[in-house]
Design a protein with these regions (language model features):
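Positively charged n-region of N-terminal signal peptides that target proteins for export
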Residues: 1-4
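Short helix-loop-beta junction
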Residues: 199-212, 304-305
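N-terminal secretory targeting modules
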Residues: 6, 12-177, 353-360
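Active-site-proximal beta-strand/loop segments in catalytic clefts of secreted hydrolases
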Residues: 181-183, 213-216, 240-243, 274-277, ...
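Catalytic His-Asp segment of secreted/periplasmic serine-dependent ester chemistry enzymes
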Residues: 277-360
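Catalytic nucleophile-elbow at a beta strand-turn-alpha helix junction centered on a G-D-S/GDSL motif
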Residues: 175-199
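Oxyanion-hole/transition-state-stabilizing segment in secreted/luminal serine hydrolases
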Residues: 194, 202, 219-256, 265, ...
Length: 360
């Protein structure tokens, strides 16, 4: 009895565990975590977005939101005929304008030739969930990518495969990543599922890793985040903080210092600023329209200062005017639906190409 008890206590701590239906579950040692620029050894959890050292460097809301796994994914290869997932989240909360599948679900894609194809979504059942994503596949090696929760954090996640199958960690993408810094929209509000935030759509479309530093209500061009994202050399930085900048004076105060911090370590990397998203409310709300115009004018003024001051590889992208939209891309006149995210991703890719920011 003592021997049996010791084996029982030890087994769950290993890199894999067996379920009752003859699937074997594998942990993070068997898949590549993508969408992060911070080494696991520097984080409280491998699925965090900020280093543990930043807990006392950023405001409390920023730290709390950084525990969400927005933009993160795991990638692996397996020849299983059935693919399952079980995961545990930190909070298990819900919102009245975003589906639980986007907040705390997981999205499965597989590499079909040269493109990533959606397969299924793991629907959350609470803090701990288990879901069969696909079954009855032929037994051949395939590459899979699983996008993690946007508005909750992953405490643990495991991939379940046939007991006779193998699983292999995918190789790291050799391309330089793209880094996004922004707001609740950057974080993924309010996609219906986790793979539909624009940063992940762009990642799949360009086959490039994308780091998502979206902080709901708190994307404010702050120096600690600028310092962190400057520690890597991406292909480009995309700054879409405007919805959280509160007032024009804050834009004037923080825009150029943000660029200077990035430039101190990455003197030539392109930095792209996105103006304020055009809410359909501004069609009729004259006060909001006036305030938004003042915000955009402040950002454009800082951009012009940099260009006149000799800054290079700084870009400014104006989002489509309201007259160019059918106004059907948001859930609440602010946050994007899947339709809005797809349109925004397509728009940004076209803009990046037009500016010559993407490798041919």
């Amino acid at each position: 009895m003592r021997t049996f008890l010791l084996l029982f206590l030890f087994f769950p701590l290993s890199s894999y565990s067996q379920s009752e239906n003859n699937s074997i579950y594998y942990d993070k040692n068997f898949f590549l975590i993508e969408g992060t620029i911070v080494a696991d050894s520097l984080k409280e959890s491998p699925y965090d977005r900020l280093p543990s050292s930043y807990k006392n460097r950023v405001r409390t809301p920023v730290w709390d939101i950084s525990k969400s796994s927005a933009g993160l994914s795991i990638r692996f290869l397996t020849n299983t005929t059935k693919l399952k997932v079980r995961w545990e989240v930190f909070n298990d909360f819900s919102m009245n304008h975003m589906p639980d599948t986007g907040i705390k679900g997981v999205d499965l894609y597989y590499k079909n030739g040269e493109r990533w194809q959606y397969i299924n979504t793991g629907r959350p059942q609470g803090k701990i969930s288990e879901y069969t994503l696909i079954e009855n596949m032929t037994e051949e090696m395939r590459e899979f990518k699983l996008f993690l929760p946007l508005y909750d954090g992953i405490k643990n996640i495991e991939i379940g495969i046939d007991s006779t199958s193998t699983i292999t960690k995918a190789l790291k993408n050799p391309k330089k990543p793209i880094v996004f810094y922004g707001t609740s929209i950057t974080q993924g509000g309010c996609a219906s599922r986790t793979g539909m935030v624009h940063t992940s759509i762009i990642s799949r479309a360009l086959d490039v890793d994308v780091a998502n530093f979206g902080f709901s209500g708190n994307g404010r061009m702050e120096q600690p985040i600028a310092e962190l994202i400057s520690t890597v050399e991406p292909s480009l930085y995309v700054i879409e903080c405007m919805p959280n900048m509160i007032k024009p004076e804050l834009i004037t105060e923080r825009t150029i210092p943000l660029v200077n911090t990035i430039r101190s370590k990455n003197p030539n990397t392109p930095i792209v600023f996105i103006d304020l998203f055009k809410s359909p409310l501004t069609f009729l709300n004259t006060k909001m329209k006036s305030e938004n115009t003042a915000m955009d004018d402040a950002l454009k003024a800082e951009f012009d200062k940099m260009i006149e001051g000799g800054y290079e590889n700084i870009y400014f992208i104006e989002t489509p005017k309201l007259t160019e939209s059918d106004h059907e891309g948001t859930v609440d006149a602010i946050h994007f639906t899947d339709l809005g995210f797809q349109r925004y991703a397509d728009f940004l890719i076209a803009q990046f190409k037009a500016l010559g920011l993407l490798a041919p």
